[in-house]
Amino acid sequence: MQIKNSKIIVIKLGSSTVVDNKGKFKKKWVNSLIKDIKEYNKEKKIVIVTSGAIALGQKYLKIKKKRIKLEMSQAVAAIGQIHLVSEFQKLFEKFKIKTGQILISPDDTEQRKRALNIRSTFNNLFTLKAIP
C-alpha cells in the first residue's frame, strides 16, 4: 500500500534514529522529519512510535552503554522518557503541531475493553489535531 492511499501513517523511530552514539538526541534529524510530518499531517493521520528512552536516560545518568538488568533499565527508561518527550515537544512546538503521548503495554492490546479505550484515545487525539 502506498502512503497516498493510507489514512494513517505510523512512523517507527528506533533508538539509533533519534539518539546518536554519544547518547545525544538528534535534534537536526528529527527537526527535518517533523518538516515532512507537517506536510503529511494536512491530509493524513500520523502516529509516531519511538524508542530512545533508555539511551537518553543512560546519557543523563552518565551510565556507560552496557547490559543492565531489566529492573534498572526500566528505571533508566523512566528517567530518559521525560527527556525524550521534552525534546520532541520542543521541536513540534516550533512547527505549531500539537502532540500527545499514549503509553501502551501488551496487556492493553490483549484485553478488549482496554484496547477499545486506546482506540478512543487515538481518535480523540486525531480530533484535537494532535499527533500521538
Task: Describe the residue ranges of each PLM region.
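Nucleotide/pyrophosphate-binding catalytic subdomain
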Residues: 1-131
